[in-house]
């Protein structure tokens, strides 16, 4: 498979096998960590391949909502990628199927979203997205929810609620454009 095909499988279907193959071609987990360090992200790190990276192990394979939004801003809205590559990346995120019950679910008709949902095996669900409200600059949002006593459906409900709050803030003009 080509890099483009692997990337599309990862973005649209969260294909872990494609993620492993693409990560191997890019220098493995340490290559990904080196890449985000080059973006100025001192928090995000990759230590293991899927599916082991989804098993909680302290500081291994981690990021934060602020760190992922900062890196995503540079990749999706900055000059890290060529315009055509940025457009393909965002189109793949827009086509993402696994995020349908998270932030995407909360957005009004006419808002464009490209997202990347994730979760670990037992207790954490997350989603980050580029959101394009009508007549506004694009915005980035990231939600991480960790609750060992809640199943995936319950965690997704919390992420949807966070998405609803985000929409209200945007509609009220309380979210500043920082692009």
Which residues does each PLM region occupy?
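Active-site phosphate/pyrophosphate-handling residues
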Residues: 17, 66, 129
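Conserved catalytic neighborhood of penicillin-recognizing serine enzymes
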Residues: 1-21, 29
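Active-site-proximal beta-strand/loop segments in catalytic clefts of secreted hydrolases
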Residues: 11-14, 22-26, 47-51, 116-118, ...
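Structured C-terminal helix/loop/strand segments within mature extracytoplasmic catalytic/sensor domains
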Residues: 25, 70-101, 106, 112, ...
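Mid-domain, small-residue-enriched loop/turn segments at the edges of structured enzyme/sensor domains
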Residues: 20-80
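Short, solvent-exposed loop/turn segments at the edges of secondary structure
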Residues: 5, 13, 63, 123-125, ...
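Short alpha-helical scaffolding segments that buttress acidic/His motifs in well-ordered protein cores
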Residues: 6-11, 22, 35-36, 72, ...
